[in-house]
Amino acid sequence: NHIVVMKGSDSAAMESLIRDADVVLLSMAGGLGIKDGKPYMDPVAYRDSYVGTAEGLIGALPAAPKLRQIIFCSSMNAYGAANGVNPVSENTPANAASPAAQVFIEAEQKLSAIETNSLKVCNFRTGTIYGPGREHRNELKHIAGKQIPFDGQSDAMLVHRDDVVRAIDFAIDHRLSGLYNLFNDIPENKADFFARVAAREGLEPVIWLGVFKGPRGVSNAKLKLAGFTFSDPSGEKEGANLLG
């Protein structure tokens, strides 16, 4: 194991990195910069983190003859409001509500287009990830009592960090391909779920403005039908290490 500092869009560096790989996992976060002494999201860098990395990997594929699977951790944000469709499944057309969310769709499409019988591509649309160090109360305290632009009436769509790891292992073991929603079974919407957490922790409730609409009635049935089971289906083990 070793660390390589590089841009994902650098195909030459990517060639060296994946030359002997049989599986590649793409799990990116990026685009955060500093402007006038304050953090801000750079849309160009953000797109390069996702779409650029997908393109860099695609350009490097001739150097990786052993590669048999690509797994990409995308985001539920790709659905946007899903054009008002309810329920929402993997067959529901994506409808990103912002340019930032559009990058997930573009990266998914670029990767899916290169799938062959010998090279499988699995795209996971993950929910909001929680777990040790990212407990619900820790995430909530940053927005408690504040107005935020997101849709409180959209599904909670949360997933434990370790269930993400387990799903990736499951995808490798079963050589999954295609698109899968990856979030647990919490039935509440965002407003109700985080109101319950706020009451428990003595925090002010969030004020959801609903500027960016989210999906409702989203299903995780496809992944469960494939045989995957969640270690934390109800979101109650937020501080637990579920892999130990």
Task: Show which residues each predicted segment covers.
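Glycine-rich "substrate-gating" loop/helix at the edge of Rossmann-like oxidoreductase active sites
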Residues: 96-101, 127-128, 132, 150-161
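Mid/C-terminal beta-alpha module of Rossmann-like enzyme folds, strongest
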Residues: 165-219
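Conserved beta-loop-beta element that borders a ligand/cofactor-binding pocket
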Residues: 109-132
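Conserved Rossmann-fold NAD(P)-dependent oxidoreductase catalytic core, especially the SDR/UDP-sugar
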Residues: 55-99
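NAD(P)-cofactor binding segment of oxidoreductase domains
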Residues: 20-71
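C-terminal amphipathic/interface module of NAD(P)-dependent oxidoreductases
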Residues: 204-244
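Conserved Rossmann-fold cofactor-binding substructure of NAD(P)-dependent oxidoreductases
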Residues: 1-22
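Alpha-helical substrate-binding/gating segment
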Residues: 138-147, 153-180
